[in-house]
């Protein structure tokens, strides 16, 4: 193992109790999208990035490269689960829970930031690491607003990870999510008496849906 990797791993091991505490607490809190108030407090005392109460950005270092590490920590409704169980066992009937390990995703991102911070401190190399708290991921919410406000423009790279059934490095990019709201308007008319005067908003919705389906195949 290289010295650089060892520096980072030693720092992570030193803080492992804190990292595990964060993972366990986020699991227990199981807060829904954009309601992760206690979960966000585990990371940072100052939230409110981009006007989102449970989003945050915490940086260390100076100069380039500037690496962003993305943490997520929201839960899903109806997925309450006792920890340490291999079968579904609700902790709270009908309660919230983590469907794909976002408690680990957030804690693992924190561990990565701790490792990079330690490397920057001990080597004196130029560079900046920023840990971004990205709430509401299950609904595709916060990152869209963070992109809108230009939060990523300062970065040379943004990295994240996700719990899986194997360990691997995925070098490809992720698809962007842009939220858009469309409103369709029609013109009311009697279907039998004067159908030619009507304009169906539903027809427009169906045509757009078909067009998007064909477009997606070629993107």
Regions found by a protein language model. Name each.
Residues 4-98, 103, 107-127:
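Acidic/His- and Gly-rich active-site-bordering loop/insert found
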């Amino acid at each position: 193992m290289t010295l650089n990797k060892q520096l980072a791993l030693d720092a992570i091991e030193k803080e492992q109790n804190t990292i595990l505490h964060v993972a366990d607490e986020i699991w227990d809190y199981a807060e829904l999208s954009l309601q992760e108030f206690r979960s966000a407090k585990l990371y940072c005392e100052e939230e409110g990035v981009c006007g989102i109460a449970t989003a945050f950005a915490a940086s260390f270092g100076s100069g380039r490269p500037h690496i962003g590490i993305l943490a997520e920590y929201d839960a899903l409704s109806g997925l309450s689960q006792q920890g340490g169980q291999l079968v579904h066992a609700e902790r709270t009937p009908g309660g919230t829970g983590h469907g794909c390990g976002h408690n680990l995703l957030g804690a693992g991102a924190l561990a990565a930031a701790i490792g990079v911070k330690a490397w920057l401190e001990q080597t004196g190399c130029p560079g900046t690491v920023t840990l971004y708290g990205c709430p509401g991921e299950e609904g595709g919410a916060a990152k869209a607003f963070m992109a809108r406000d230009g939060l990523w423009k300062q970065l040379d790279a943004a990295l994240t990870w996700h719990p899986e059934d194997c360990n691997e490095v995925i070098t490809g990019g992720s698809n962007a999510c842009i939220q858009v709201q469309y409103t369709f308007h029609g013109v009311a008319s009697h279907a039998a008496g004067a159908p030619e005067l009507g304009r169906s908003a539903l027809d427009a919705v169906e045509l757009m849906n078909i067009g998007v389906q064909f477009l997606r195949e070629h993107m």
